[in-house]
Swiss-Prot record:
This is Phragmoplastin DRP1C. SMART domains: DYNc, GED. The lineage of its organism: Eukaryota, Viridiplantae, Streptophyta, Embryophyta, Tracheophyta. Its main location: cytoplasm. One of its GO terms (cellular component) is clathrin-coated vesicle. It is found in: Cytoplasm; Cytoplasm, Cytoskeleton; Cytoplasm, Cell cortex; Cytoplasmic vesicle, Clathrin-coated vesicle. Residues 68-70 are annotated as: G2 motif. Transmembrane segments: none annotated. Microtubule-associated force-producing protein that is targeted to the growing edges of the cell plate during cytokinesis. Also plays a major role in plasma membrane maintenance during pollen maturation. Has a GTPase activity. Residues 42-49 are annotated as: G1 motif. The gene is DRP1C. Residues 242-245 are annotated as: G5 motif. Residues 32-301 form the Dynamin-type G domain. Keywords: Cell cycle, Cell division, Cytoplasm, Cytoplasmic vesicle, Cytoskeleton, GTP-binding, Hydrolase, Microtubule, Motor protein, Nucleotide-binding. GO terms for molecular function: GTP binding; GTPase activity.
Amino acid sequence: MATMKSLIGLINKIQRACTVLGDHGGEGMSLWEALPTVAVVGGQSSGKSSVLESVVGRDFLPRGSGIVTRRPLVLQLHKTEDGTTEYAEFLHAPKKRFADFAAVRKEIEDETDRITGKSKQISNIPIQLSIYSPNVVNLTLIDLPGLTKVAVDGQPESIVQDIENMVRSYVEKPNCIILAISPANQDIATSDAIKLAREVDPTGERTFGVATKLDIMDKGTDCLDVLEGRSYRLQHPWVGIVNRSQADINKRVDMIAARRKEQEYFETSPEYGHLASRMGSEYLAKLLSQHLETVIRQKIPSIVALINKSIDEINAELDRIGRPIAVDSGAQLYTILELCRAFDRVFKEHLDGGRPGGDRIYGVFDHQLPAALKKLPFDRHLSTKNVQKVVSEADGYQPHLIAPEQGYRRLIDGSISYFKGPAEATVDAVHFVLKELVRKSISETEELKRFPTLASDIAAAANEALERFRDESRKTVLRLVDMESSYLTVEFFRKLHLEPEKEKPNPRNAPAPNADPYSDNHFRKIGSNVSAYINMVCDTLRNSLPKAVVYCQVREAKRSLLNFFYAQVGRKEKEKLGAMLDEDPQLMERRGTLAKRLELYKQARDDIDAVAWK
């Protein structure tokens, strides 16, 4: 069956591991907060430090005026065999044993200053102190800064609320046992500790009341109403404590002797003699130790459940952010190629419609290209005035006889050249969409988020490939336009009705305007014929340009976006492969933290399993 020593020792061990990992409570549920603890709460000058020293049987806590305890002190007491030497160990100095308890006090002060500086600031980072002695019981106590009502010189005005918030963060946890220290020579209703305990534990199920300074109460008064639970009832009995006087402290009266003196006080007291067996620091320590053991037994199932849940959550997060990468070049190359394929899958999903974005390419063909073609200045180029000018220039000094073929060709060539602008604009628009899809695909590839260097390399390689595809596509679409100029569709003109238009008779029987081969009507007819031919070419290019762009850019992007990159990676040495897999420092730090926390939880589970519970 699990003994008190093994149970409390188990919790102590897990607490120390939590502190090493920086788990000392805070927002949300943590293993630290799931562990049963005893928090010592009291106002300044309530005798809180003296109670702790009485329980330990040693002078070891810093003393002075104002706020002395400025960091939580996790005090783990380990009972040893009679006759063994007492010593103390700090978690931050694990290889150093302190046999001189004056040195323990000095180390507490120094370790406090290491975090808070020489100021009177406070910190919620705990100090872990273990004391091994035959004069203690197995017990863990957390000494918290004393509650205060005013700030002293050198402290911010917020110190009063800061201390209360820190103390409250401990005592409001359902697994915290509250040891509320109240001086008996003051009205219990004004006790800072009792007031706070009442707020966080209104039923008193988690609160142990301790009345100090019973020996210096005014004559004719006593603390029986409190100790017997009449003035303020708790679920657990009140315990009276008689601490050493200042004179005893100055004389360095031995703590063991002070314990005997305390017990004699209760046994010989007319007021408290009938309560003597349930008074004093020794009884308080045993009472707390027994209760802590009971609470630990009750809480172990929920602690195990929390540990198992935390292990599952940590493993899930490690899987999400990725496990550490192997250091050999083969594994690194395999990892890089797998990450490239993951990016490639996301990119293709965008193009194929599995993700949004690919539809923008169709928008270029269906809206942007037709709109650009409609805006071409054919009306100006094929105006009667310009047609006449071009035809006349083509004829030169010898006018055409029947049809101005050279004029036609010049007008057609000039018109077709306008298509180069929309063709190149279509190539550039699709290139822009593809680049944007590369950017989106990089950001949406979860596996790449831990490798910013590789993500940048892939993006650069993909964009370089897209530029090559764009250049080839631009050459192709310009060839398509040039092909329309290089060989005209003669059949189109043969089918045209080339007879001059019949005009209504001139009322004055004047000759018809089109009788003159150089009349406006004649040039309008030429412009109309060229316009009809250009419309046919426009329809052809409206269909062929998208085909060329898709073939040269979209199709190649799907087929071979990273082919050149694959070849480059395959030739890299181990060091360069490793550099490509450099991770985000914050991610590496997070993985390290998770790995340590996972180790903590697994070790805690093993430690709990190792305890015999039957």
